[in-house]
């Protein structure tokens, strides 16, 4: 019994070990709920399952319906497991049967192989026995057989030598020149060695005469212009085997090739598409040059000693001479390529040209095909950049011409003049889009699929000095220079530049300074990541140039608009007789025109510039004039001006007043806002008005007319300037100067002035 129980324990231990390996396979070795579940005696799937405890627990904890459900579930599981077991048994049985058949077949095959190996061993033994018998039989005659074989070989060679002249003639008659040369080459050393023997000397003489005739025939074929390159190579190879001078053959071979290459160059003189031109040149000249070089090297470079060096030097000199003409034609054709419509055509042509030069560069490194081709590509790229720069300049000039025409075009009934904001936006967008288009076209030179893009120039200098500095920076400087020219020279047909164009260009340059320049250069640097560390123009320098240009244009705009208003005021003062004029009843039309023009300028400037900052206005800004040049003050101030008793006192009073008044800088720097621009124009206009008044003499009514006009200007101009006191002071000086120059200074009542201005 103890033995039986021990056996059962061993079996249980084996089962537990197998079960443990299964748990290890399914990853259930960790401590936790899985282990606790298998130790539970009521777990059907556990190792320690106890049926009695399981049934007792079910009866205690479950109702009848639950027991029936458990029964149904267990029946279903049993059926499922039974079905799976049957399937496994069937599959394993099939595999077992298949394995049995395979083993049986292998046994049969090995048995056949054993029989064949036995037969092979028997045959090898028989062969070995026969070989030993033959060797023992022929051992005594081996030396005799070897001697006879040598004699036989010698007789065959002698027979070949005696038959050689006849064979050579036969080959020449059949045109088998290569075979004849081969025969003679094999026998030449033997004939030369035994030429002292009469029989061999005669054979040698006959052979030399025959081969001399063959050499003449080969030279004629070699010099025939209609001979193909293959025929030339064969002729040269045979002549070299006939020991013709190598240097003469080199010269003749190259001279024959010169004609073919020169004909290709003459064909390239015809004009055509650049890509077609490159294809024709590469397919004709370059291909034939490569073929000629390869044939030449295969014929002459294999010669030993100095012959190979001499041949290589001749080939290098020959190709350098002819390639110079070819490269000149290519550069001449590239200079004719002025069309900028499709830059990809030029880049493709240059890429193909550069690629096709790699073959001759490898064949003949001394010619420098690759170096010279790269130089041509670089010069073509530089020329293209210069063309694009000029195209950008022309495009900008064309845009400015369109803007000028739009500004100068007569207004049609029912159609408004184009707004400056729209013209500025259109001009800026057009120029920017054109720059992007040019950058995209130029970027083709650095594309990854272009062969020459990996050259140092296109990785460095082309990007930084060519595109950035030579194209973009140069164009930005050109824009500023072109804009400045409108301030320095008269326009077309001697007319001055339209003030609106000056204003528009000043805003364009200001926009360039604030954002456009940085955007363009950033875009350029991102597209052309060069490896060159050469110094470049900083963005701040270009922005300063653009701002300076904008300031110059704006100052010129203020001067030109101030000049327009000043001309009206000057003519209105100079063409009127102020002494005998009638009593004023209304505001002069020129003053209304001045207010209208300045209002129009205000609207025009407001389309492009911000409002700006004004000083705080007083509540009675439009009426402050009355307190300054009122009738009572004028009477007290200037009543004694023209009496001989007190001229010095009046002048002293006027000068003292000027000392305490704030100095007005007429041509001060204009700020980039509407208020500053209008202030500058009004200062120039009123200063001109003041100087013209100082040069005239006035009567009573002339002074009163000036009073009315100045009051009208004060009513409307104060709102345009940054400081209303500026208008106040200038108009006060105008009225004061008129009163000072008046023969009968009797000012008009303030209430009357007010009524006239309101009515006007």
From Swiss-Prot:
SUPFAM superfamilies: Cullin repeat-like. The keyword Transport applies. It holds the Pfam family Sec5. GO terms for biological process: endocytic recycling; lipid transport; protein transport. It is found in: Golgi apparatus, trans-Golgi network; Recycling endosome. Keywords: Coiled coil, Endosome, Golgi apparatus, Lipid transport, Protein transport, Transport. Residues 97-127, 374-395 form a coiled coil. GO terms for cellular component: EARP complex; GARP complex; recycling endosome. Component of the Golgi-associated retrograde protein (GARP) complex Component of the endosome-associated retrograde protein (EARP) complex. Involved in retrograde transport from early and late endosomes to the late Golgi. The GARP complex is required for the maintenance of protein retrieval from endosomes to the TGN, acid hydrolase sorting, lysosome function, endosomal cholesterol traffic and autophagy. Acts as a component of the EARP complex that is involved in endocytic recycling. Belongs to the VPS51 family. This is Vacuolar protein sorting-associated protein 51 homolog. It comes from Xenopus tropicalis (Western clawed frog).
């Amino acid at each position: 019994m103890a033995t039986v129980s021990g056996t059962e324990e061993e079996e249980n231990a084996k089962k537990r070990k197998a079960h443990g390996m299964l748990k290890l396979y399914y990853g259930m070795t960790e401590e936790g709920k899985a282990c606790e579940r298998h130790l539970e005696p009521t777990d059907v799937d556990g190792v320690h399952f106890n049926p009695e405890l399981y049934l007792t627990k079910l009866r205690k904890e479950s109702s009848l319906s639950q027991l029936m459900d458990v029964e149904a579930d267990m029946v279903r599981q049993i059926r499922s497991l039974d079905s799976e077991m049957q399937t496994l048994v069937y599959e394993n049985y099939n595999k077992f049967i298949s394995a049995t058949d395979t083993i049986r077949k292998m046994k049969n095959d090995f048995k056949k192989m054993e029989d064949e190996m036995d037969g092979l061993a028997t045959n090898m033994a028989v062969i070995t026995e026969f070989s030993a018998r033959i060797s023992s039989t022929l051992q005594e005659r081996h030396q005799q057989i070897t001697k006879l074989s040598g004699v036989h070989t010698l007789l065959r060679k002698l027979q070949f030598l005696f038959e050689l002249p006849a064979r050579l003639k036969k080959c020449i008659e059949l045109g088998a020149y290569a075979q004849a040369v081969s025969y003679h080459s094999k026998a030449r050393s033997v004939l030369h060695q035994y030429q002292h023997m009469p029989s061999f000397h005669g054979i040698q003489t006959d052979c030399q005469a025959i081969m001399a005739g063959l050499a003449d025939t080969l030279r004629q074929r070699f010099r025939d212009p209609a001979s193909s390159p293959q025929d030339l190579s064969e002729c040269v190879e045979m002549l070299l085997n006939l020991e013709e001078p190598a240097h003469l053959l080199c010269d003749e071979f190259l001279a024959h090739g010169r004609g073919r290459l020169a004909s290709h160059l003459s064909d390239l003189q015809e004009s055509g598409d650049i890509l077609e031109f490159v294809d024709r040149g590469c397919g004709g000249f370059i291909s034939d040059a490569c073929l000629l070089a390869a044939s030449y090297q295969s014929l002459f470079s294999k010669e030993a000693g100095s012959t190979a060096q001499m041949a290589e030097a001749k080939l290098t000199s020959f190709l350098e001479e002819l390639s110079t003409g070819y490269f000149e034609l290519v550069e001449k054709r590239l200079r004719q390529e002025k069309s900028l419509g499709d830059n990809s055509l030029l880049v493709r042509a240059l890429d193909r040209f550069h690629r096709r030069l790699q073959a001759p560069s490898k064949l003949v490194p001394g010619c420098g095909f690759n170096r010279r081709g790269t130089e041509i590509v670089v010069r073509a790229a530089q020329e293209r950049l210069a063309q694009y720069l000029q195209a950008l300049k022309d495009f900008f000039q064309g845009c400015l011409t369109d803007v000028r025409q739009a500004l100068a075009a007569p207004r049609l009934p029912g159609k408004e003049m184009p707004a400056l904001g729209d013209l500025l936006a259109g001009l800026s967008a057009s120029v920017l889009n054109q720059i992007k288009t040019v950058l995209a076209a130029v970027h083709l030179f650095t594309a990854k699929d272009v062969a020459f893009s990996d050259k140092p120039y296109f990785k460095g200098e082309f990007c930084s000095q060519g595109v950035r500095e030579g194209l973009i920076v140069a164009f930005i400087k050109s824009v500023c220079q072109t804009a400045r020219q409108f301030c320095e020279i008269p326009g077309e047909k001697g007319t001055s530049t339209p003030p609106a164009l000056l204003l528009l260009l000043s805003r364009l340059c200001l926009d360039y300074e604030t954002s456009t320049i940085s955007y363009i250069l950033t875009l350029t640097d991102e597209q052309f990541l060069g490896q060159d560390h050469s110094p470049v123009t900083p963005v701040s320098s270009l922005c300063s140039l653009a701002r300076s240009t904008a300031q110059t244009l704006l100052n010129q705009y203020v001067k030109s608009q101030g000049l327009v208003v000043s001309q009206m005021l000057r003519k209105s003062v100079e063409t009127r007789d102020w002494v005998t004029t009638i009593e004023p009843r209304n505001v002069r039309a020129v003053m209304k025109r001045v207010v209208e023009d300045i209002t129009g300028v205000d609207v025009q400037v407001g389309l492009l510039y911000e409002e700006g900052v004004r000083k705080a206005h007083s509540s009675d800004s439009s009426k402050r004039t009355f307190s300054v040049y009122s009738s009572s003050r004028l009477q007290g101030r200037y009543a004694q001006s023209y009496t001989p008793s007190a001229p010095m006192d009046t002048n002293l009073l006027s000068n003292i007043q000027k000392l305490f008044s704030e100095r007005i800088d007429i041509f001060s720097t204009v700020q980039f806002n509407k208020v500053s621009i209008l202030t500058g124009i009004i200062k120039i206009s009123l200063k001109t008005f003041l100087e013209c008044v100082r040069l005239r003499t006035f009567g009573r009514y002339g002074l009163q007319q000036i009073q009315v006009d100045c009051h009208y200007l004060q009513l409307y101009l104060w709102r345009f300037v940054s400081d209303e006191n500026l208008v106040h002071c200038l108009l006060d000086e105008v009225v004061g100067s008129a009163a000072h120059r008046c023969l009968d200074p009797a000012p008009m009542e303030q209430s009357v002035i007010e009524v006239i201005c309101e009515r006007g």
